[in-house]
Structures are given as C-alpha cells and as structure tokens.
Swiss-Prot record:
Belongs to the ARPC5 family. GO terms for cellular component: Arp2/3 protein complex; cell cortex; cytoplasm; cytosol; pseudopodium. This is Actin-related protein 2/3 complex subunit 5. Keywords: Actin-binding, Cell projection, Cytoplasm, Cytoskeleton. InterPro entries: ARPC5 (IPR006789), ARPC5_sf (IPR036743). It comes from the Eukaryota. Functions as a component of the Arp2/3 complex which is involved in regulation of actin polymerization and together with an activating nucleation-promoting factor (NPF) mediates the formation of branched actin networks. Seems to contact the pointed end of the daughter actin filament. The Arp2/3 complex is involved in organizing the actin system in cell motility and chemotaxis, in phagocytosis and macropinocytosis, at late steps of endosome processing, and in mitosis.
Amino acid sequence: MNYEDDNVESGQAGKSDAEYKADIANREKEVTKALNAGKPQDALNVALADPPIYTKTGAIKDQNATIVLNLLGSFKDKDVETSVETLNDDQLDILMKYVYRGLATGENSPIFFKWHECVLKKGGAGTIIRVISEKKTV
C-alpha cells in the first residue's frame, strides 16, 4: 500500500490526492471561465461534478468546498430556483451537501437557505434523508 492509498476511504477505488488537486484546479478555472462568460448554470454544473468525496484529506475537501460555496453565494436570489430546476437527482444531493456545509459556516446564511428551499422543493424530503444519512462528505 502506498501513501496515496492511505488517503482514500476504504472500499473505494478513488483518485489520489494529487489527482484531486489537479481536478480542483481545473474546476476552479472552468467555474471562473463560465462565470466570466455570464453562464452561471454552466459554472454550477462544473462545480458539482465529481466532488472529492472519497478522500480523507480535509484540505482537499475544503479547497473544493470554497469554490462551490463562493459560486453559490454569487448567484442572484432570483436565479437560484431556475438553476436548481435544471439539476438531476445526483446533482441535487451533492448541492444539498454543500448547502449544509455552507450553513455550518454561519456566513451568508440567507443565500444558503434560499438554495435549501429550492433543492427541497425540487428533490423532496428524500434529498435531505439521503444527504444526512450518507457517510461520504464534501
């Protein structure tokens, strides 16, 4: 077993931390590019794709969460529901994990409550149940 295997949750053939770091750097560039092009929905899709749920390295999860939470905070209130409506169930679950993470910071709570309301409206209580019972965190 090598060092990289030690940082992957057991039972999962996840990526190495180096691969996650490269993915996160690319994700940040793509999110910024989409936002600069006036395409927040594209930025959201990129931000929610392939989160680092299989790593045990908190710094990697924190770095990715910063990208997602900053993106969520940048949405205009009126655009949140429209954006949520385009997401599939897996994306809704991932988004809800980030919403709870954002609420846990105690910062920018009104926008995270708006996201929560819209995700709950579309995904129903099942989204909340899956998120709170899931062991893999973002």
